[in-house]
Amino acid sequence: MSRTVPLERQRNIGIMAHIDAGKTTTTERILYYTGVSHKIGEVHDGAATMDWMEQEQERGITITSAATTCSWKDHTINIIDTPGHVDFTIEVERSLRVLDGAVAVFDAVAGVEPQSETVWRQANRYGVPRICFVNKMDRIGANFFRCVDMMVERLRAKPIPIQLPIGSEDKFEGVVDLISGKAIKFDKSSKGVEFTEEDVPADMMDLYLEKRLALVEAVAEEDEALLEKYLGGEELTEEEIISCVRKATIARNIVPVFCGSAFRNMGVQPLLDAVVAFLPSPLDIEQMKGMNPDNEEETIVCPCSDKEPLAGLVFKLFSDPYIGHLSFFRIYSGFIESGMTVLNSTTGKKERVGRLLRMHANKREEIKWAGAGDIVAVVGLKQASTGDTMCDEKRPVVLESLDIPEPVIEVAIEPKTKADRDALSAALAKLAKEDPSFRVKGDEETGQTLIAGMGELHLEIIVDRLTREFSVNANVGKPQVAYRETITASSKSDMKHVKQSGGRGQYGHAVIEIEPNPGKGYEFVNAITGGVIPKEYIAPVDKGIQDAMKSGVLAGFPTVDIKVTLVFGSYHDVDSSEQAFYVTGSMAIKDAVHKASPVLLEPIMDVEVVTPDEYLGDVMGDLNGRRGRVQNMEARVGSQAVRAQVPLSEMFGYATDLRSKTQGRATFTMQFHHYERVPAQLAEEVIKKKG
């Protein structure tokens, strides 16, 4: 099959931001101007095309990453609109993993907010080039340059304005393009479709010249010949500046900044021009690398070409009530077509590709073929999980998977009636497969089912989906903190598991040493020499240890951040088995942890409260009373932003308390920051409750 649009004219981008910065509205305008949507959907009407789940339309927030395709100036743009609410961080994570570029949307009044920082860090981790759009320039308190300064202070970025706003707040009427030297003003009667290009306003000329000089100096360094030309006193042409900005953006040396008001239909077409001009095509990014599943030392490069063997990543699963199981798939090399057989190299199983769909939010177009660089939805991959690699069986390769955040909050859930019992288990299993940051586990002591997630809203929406999509009714307990356990000292365990009861017995012997491994999770080192434990019994010891760590020795919470070294052991020719060594591993770790001064850990949250000045004292006093540590404060227009770190256990019900303390005028955001040791007295209470 041949492509209708060459790869160099394709863009895979994400739109990312803090909640309420205007991401979905910006995406809606993009769809309107590119001709996909004939009517502009407004988020506050509950009619936005990209927010298509019922809960999204009711709450006015984006929960899942809707994927859509549109065209602009002979380019194809695949857009993923990601949620800005911290409870849905996994959606942002999995989108950034498969994108080539991103548009970061900022609120011109609030500037860089906590979730903006989280998303920015995620984009840094995946090396995603980005451009910025300072939105809501028409709102009271909008300040473009303060927003740019905050990008330097909080994001450690190198923002370079490509536009300047003409006016602000209710006088905002357009932008000055620093490259073309034109003022662009948008026609309100045509919803911004029509716009005029004029000369730079006289009162902005000095600012224009100053900022244009800064732009040229920042990007000329990308090209030695152009730098010489510039230093020699010659003017750079528009084409030369655009070429330099593109190189610098893709190299992540600068972040071009644009501005506008998506809701007022101002500044979106120049933003689309920038996506095409400055963000990379699949050919511009570093070639994807993976490893050979049969030889982990061997790196396999997957060049972005349809002629190469297939390699792609499943980055999202979704259950469609009409079609069934959808797997969202990014192809890095090769092609995929309906009917072909692919290898899931993560599981080692083969799968048959059913139908292929190109998604437009919740509408879909059936296609027969997709090639390197494409993002499509596949029907029929029954065994696939998020993060799995699909490839050509003749060239197996495993691509790097996703970073899955650990849940910090859990609730007990039970079916309302006997009829709901089986349906509840099946529905929870389906939802856990779709969303890797959502976990389901059984509490062996109480017999309860616990569901765990990234926050109260995350779990609320899961329970809501059980009723709406699966017609399952469930009772939900009060939220509980997802505590963890760890060790503070090193220890050793010499464990023998011997069972003799007629017939074949059981024999396993392992000596392990454990030590704290702060922030690095679980690590297993096999230091066995001379075959004192045969090779085939090493993995069962490791598995036994990991399974035992799911329920800690203090209060049954998962044990984390431990390095285990298997140093010695012995076996019996007849009585040793994988099962015997599995049991030995599990007994050894419990014994070793008991000796290693175990402690309880609790999640600490980053909290930002924006409050009117007159309530500042009450807000600060309340945070201190919740064991909070204030990190910094910042004055905003008529209000103060307070940032603090507070234990999650102290934050339940905070929204209601804050509303009553400030007459509903303060707002707050909260996201997980790190785990920290629980003070001894409180730890005793938690352990007693569990005991």
Swiss-Prot record:
What HAMAP family does the database record attribute to this sequence?
Answer: EF_G_EF_2_B
- From the record, give the cysteines joined by S-S bonds: none
Q: Does the keyword Cytoplasm apply?
A: yes
Classification lineage: Bacteria, Pseudomonadati, Thermodesulfobacteriota, Desulfovibrionia, Desulfovibrionales
Originating organism: Nitratidesulfovibrio vulgaris (strain DSM 19637 / Miyazaki F) (Desulfovibrio vulgaris)
Gene Ontology terms for molecular function: GTP binding; GTPase activity; translation elongation factor activity
Q: Which residues form the tr-type G domain?
A: 8-283
Q: Where is this gene product found?
A: Cytoplasm
- Indicate the family of this protein: Belongs to the TRAFAC class translation factor GTPase superfamily. Classic translation factor GTPase family. EF-G/EF-2 subfamily.
Q: Which gene encodes it?
A: fusA
Q: Which Pfam families match?
A: EF-G_D2, EFG_C, EFG_III, EFG_IV, GTP_EFTU
Which SUPFAM superfamilies does UniProt cross-reference here?
A: EF-G C-terminal domain-like, P-loop containing nucleoside triphosphate hydrolases, Ribosomal protein S5 domain 2-like, Translation proteins
Any one Gene Ontology cellular component term annotated for this protein: cytoplasm
Write the record's keywords in alphabetical order, separated by commas.
Answer: Cytoplasm, Elongation factor, GTP-binding, Nucleotide-binding, Protein biosynthesis
* Task performed by this protein: Catalyzes the GTP-dependent ribosomal translocation step during translation elongation. During this step, the ribosome changes from the pre-translocational (PRE) to the post-translocational (POST) state as the newly formed A-site-bound peptidyl-tRNA and P-site-bound deacylated tRNA move to the P and E sites, respectively. Catalyzes the coordinated movement of the two tRNA molecules, the mRNA and conformational changes in the ribosome.
Entry coiled-coil feature ranges: none
Give the source's domain of life in one word: Bacteria
Q: Which GO terms describe its biological process?
A: ribosome disassembly
Q: What is this protein called?
A: Elongation factor G
- Positions bound to GTP: 17-24, 81-85, 135-138
